[in-house]
């Protein structure tokens, strides 16, 4: 498996995706399901495929993905990041184009923690003068 598969790990919010690519017909499997069945929204599928469209490798690779944690949007972002890293592992000359598009950089935005005395992260408790 090590010789023919290239891999990459992607992260976004609280989601982690392990991506394995090999030469094939363009079949994408997420957690043993087809990508259409796993992601309900078309925008999530588009986000996942962005690195492949950018590098013109849509029908070149079979992709196997294991993803856990977070919601649909975070998982789609993690898959995109993982596919990008796997493509760079396959061919390092793709890195400048992927980096220019902003796919190589890990999106570091996380949920801000709830503070003591507040209702949420920044929303304060209602104040009453009387």
From Swiss-Prot:
SUPFAM superfamilies from the UniProt entry: Ribosomal protein S5 domain 2-like
CC terms in the record's Gene Ontology section: cytosolic small ribosomal subunit
GO biological process, one term: translation
MF terms (GO), sorted A to Z: RNA binding; structural constituent of ribosome
InterPro entries, per database record: Ribosomal_Su5_D2-typ_SF, Ribosomal_uS9, Ribosomal_uS9_bac/plastid, Ribosomal_uS9_CS, Ribsml_uS5_D2-typ_fold_subgr
The keyword Ligase appears for this protein: no
Top-rank lineage group of the source organism: Bacteria
Database matches in PROSITE patterns: RIBOSOMAL_S9
Keywords: Ribonucleoprotein, Ribosomal protein
Coiled-coil parts of chain: none
Family: Belongs to the universal ribosomal protein uS9 family.
Name of the protein this chain belongs to: Small ribosomal subunit protein uS9
């Amino acid at each position: 498996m090590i010789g023919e598969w290239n891999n990459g790990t992607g992260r976004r919010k609280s989601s982690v995706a392990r991506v394995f690519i090999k030469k094939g017909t363009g079949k994408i499997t997420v957690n043993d399901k087809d990508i259409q069945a796993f992601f309900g929204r078309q925008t999530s599928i588009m986000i996942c495929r962005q690195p492949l469209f950018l590098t013109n490798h849509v029908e070149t690779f079979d992709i196997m993905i294991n993803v856990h944690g977070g919601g649909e949007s975070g998982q789609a972002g993690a898959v995109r990041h993982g596919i990008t890293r796997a493509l760079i592992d396959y061919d390092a000359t793709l890195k400048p184009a992927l980096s220019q598009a902003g796919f190589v950089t890990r999106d570091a935005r996380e949920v801000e923690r709830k503070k003591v005395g507040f209702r949420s992260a920044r929303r304060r408790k209602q104040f009453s003068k009387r």
